[in-house]
């Protein structure tokens, strides 16, 4: 699924033999479209700049034998010590997971919570929070690696402050449309 990226990701995927479906609009629309087109009983939502670790498939299958869904821990593709541990700190202090953690779910649980809501921002946070309320959420001990481009481009402290502010405002009921203007996409 490609939500309208302009960085050549879709073309790279095509040249590697992948079927690329473009779903213009928000990431939530792309993930919903992907889930509708998927034929399996398990769904894994992987961002284009995130890499799964060895053994990911087996770990997901084992977790999903118990139903529900889950996610991986995250590390950033940056050698700076603080960024290497930021994923664990983010998880510990912010709680719910985000899309760069390769969220996975059974189709039954996906349908039970109504899938992704068509939000312009916080769609992964919202999805994972609702999934956790089903009582069947697994945080795997394996790490995915994701791009730290926003941290490199805007600075880590600025990025963290913006993320925490947006999450706090979202939890306080501020409209996702308004929040999206504060956190432009990096594609």
Task: Spell out what each predicted region is.
Residues 129-187:
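Hydrophobic helical membrane-anchoring modules
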Residues 43:
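Short aromatic/hydrophobic "clamp" motif used to bind/position activated sugar donors
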Residues 54-81:
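Conserved donor NDP-sugar-binding/catalytic core segment of glycosyltransferases
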Residues 68-78, 87-108:
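A recurrent flexible, glycine/aromatic-enriched loop bordering the glycosyltransferase active site
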Residues 7-16, 55:
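Acidic helix N-cap motif at the loop->helix transition within catalytic regions
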Residues 121-127:
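Acidic donor-binding loop at a coil-to-helix junction in glycosyltransferase catalytic cores
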Residues 2-10, 50:
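A conserved acidic beta->alpha catalytic loop
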Residues 12, 22-38:
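Glycine-rich, basic loop-to-helix element that forms the pyrophosphate-binding segment
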């Amino acid at each position: 699924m490609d939500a309208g990226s302009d960085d050549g990701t879709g073309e790279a995927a095509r040249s590697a033999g992948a079927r690329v479906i473009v779903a213009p609009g928000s990431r939530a629309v792309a993930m919903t479209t992907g889930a509708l087109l998927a034929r399996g009983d398990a769904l894994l939502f992987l961002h284009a700049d995130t890499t799964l670790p060895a053994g990911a498939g087996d770990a997901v299958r084992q977790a999903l034998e118990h139903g529900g869904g889950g996610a991986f821990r995250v590390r950033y593709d940056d050698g700076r010590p603080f960024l290497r541990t930021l994923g664990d700190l983010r998880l510990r202090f912010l709680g719910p997971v985000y899309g760069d953690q390769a969220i996975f779910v059974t189709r039954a649980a996906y349908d039970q919570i109504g899938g992704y809501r068509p939000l312009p921002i916080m769609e992964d946070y919202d999805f994972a929070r609702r999934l956790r309320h089903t009582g069947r959420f697994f945080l795997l001990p394996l790490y995915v690696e994701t791009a730290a481009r926003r941290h490199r481009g805007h600075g880590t402290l600025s990025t963290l402050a913006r993320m925490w502010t947006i999450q706090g405002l979202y939890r306080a009921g501020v409209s996702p449309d308004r929040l999206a203007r504060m956190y432009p996409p990096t594609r």
